[in-house]
Amino acid sequence: MAMSLKKIGAIAVGGAMVASALASGVMAATTSGDVAGFMKNAIKEDGTPNVDIVVGSGAAVMDVVSAADVAAKIGSMAYKTGVVEDRSAVVKVSAKAESDDVNIFTLNATNEDIALVAAADSDYAKGFINGSDQLKVTDQLASGSIQDVNDADFNATSLGDVSTMLKVPDIDPSDWYSNDDDAGEVVFTRIVYDSDKLSIDEDQILYASIAYKNDEDVFNDNNTVTLKPGMRIPFLGEEYAVVKIDDEDDIIYLGKEAKDGVLKEGEXFAVGNGYEVKIASILKSGDTSTEYSVNVQILKDGKVVKEKTDTVGGSSSAQLKLAYKDVGVVVNDAWEDIAGTTGYAEVLITKDTKALELGEEYIPDWEAYAALNNSDKLEIKKDITESDKANIIGIALKYVGDKKKKLGDRDEVDIANYLKLVFDDEDKNDVLKVKFLMDESKEVTLDIGQKATVLNAEVRLKDILADAQQSVKLTAPIAKLDSEVSLDTADKNLILVGGPVVNALTKELVDAGKVAIDNTSPATLAVVEGAANGNDVLVVAGGDREATREAAKALLEMI
């Protein structure tokens, strides 16, 4: 079955971008030609790709995954210099990607309303649609919002993934809760017919970041994870840690990791901008207790501006949570050395800490909400209680701006300054296609050796050059279908993923006797010089899709 391969455009900067995890025990591939030399030239000096990746129109899912992995890995070969400030740098990361599209006229010829969903992972999007083609949202959310869940004629449609929306593959990297769960971004919109014109009203666009159990993607009670302090989730393309969920003031605090580790009693950690966090004291509660009374201070320019003492550890696994302006602190555990003379605290300290005031506008026209799982359906709330905290599985932003009227060709609807919903009639009378689009840039400040996850790329600052001042935009190569590329007109080097059965360009090379691959071939990496309009070609293939996957893994190991 032919597959539609969307453009892959995440930009990896400054060191290493984590692509799909590779299985252990990678097999060696049969090589022909200078594979290492080919890959050395995959990125130009200006940071732009010198290669297109081509997958067959009839490719299996495994071939598509291999192409995506190779694209991401090539992006990680580039380096980015930022604005130097002491031993840190401001690094700009950009990304462009789009979802599948749908022709509204074909989807709803009878002028019925439609609901669209896309996500960081296409399975998350599909997992939000039930067997009756309805979104899994509560009546409370649906009332005047995403859709009427009781309307059997109301069809919801998945537009798959926007590959640069962020998915966090491990929300508990410090193993505070001994899990390896995931979290991903999802976006919903409802388009209604209003006097035969398309419109989007207030409350009819929703962005959400939701925590799922490991390898689960269907939204239901069994598959989502309750948010707890220290967990990492995506928020508008960047990875944040949960600092505190405050049910008294209806605020969820999120921050970017500054330190995740252990501080000794009396030790201070410099967060930046004059702020420090100090573990002022750690006192044991009794001779046999595992509970400790911990005092934490936040200092600004050497003066204490916020202080808290609370119980940590014990049978209840109590935590200390504290937030002040840009700084957040979670103390997860505490203990003493064997002599009982020095205390230690396991801490998460965050910078750029944000207070999401529920029911208030986080940015103009977008209100913040807690996202809950209510009997297999998504619910959003602005007034949360202590009992609600057990069901909070994410955060959400809801559109509360003016109605978008008479939507048509070339119209764009902004989604939280992060995504867009775009319309295109392709110059045809019976066509109006709609899709989600991202064309976004973000800046992140990193110390040497520090990493951050932003726009679905993991960025690590390897080093700072003395003259590192110039900003260079780096772009990962774009994956294309074999129907979009010709060996006769190619303007750059090509990587062909898949053998002659699934990739038409590979078949051309085989038929011309330039590469030898058939259905019995092992994992193969073969460079054919000058075969693409004077440009070189690297074939990544094997006798079947498993062999092709092994060839791709072998290539990634070589880079």
UniProtKB/Swiss-Prot annotation:
The alphabetical list of record keywords is:
Cell wall, Cell wall biogenesis/degradation, Glycoprotein, S-layer, Secreted, Signal
Q: Does the keyword Kinase apply?
A: no
Query: What biological processes does GO assign it?
Result: cell wall organization
Keyword field contains Cell wall biogenesis/degradation: yes
Example GO CC term: the record gives: S-layer
This protein's major location comes to secreted
Signal peptide residues are: 1-28
Question: Could you tell me the superkingdom of the organism this chain comes from?
Answer: Archaea
- Going by the UniProt annotation, this protein carries glycans at N108, N130, N155, N222, N373
Q: Where in the cell is it found?
A: Secreted, Cell wall, S-layer
InterPro entries per record: S_layer_C (IPR022651), S_layer_central (IPR022650), S_layer_MJ (IPR006454)
Q: Which NCBIfam families match?
A: S_layer_MJ
Function comment: S-layer protein. The S-layer is a paracrystalline mono-layered assembly of proteins which coat the surface of the cell.
Q: Which family does it belong to?
A: Belongs to the Mj S-layer protein family.
Q: What is this protein called?
A: S-layer protein
Protein species of origin: Methanothermococcus thermolithotrophicus
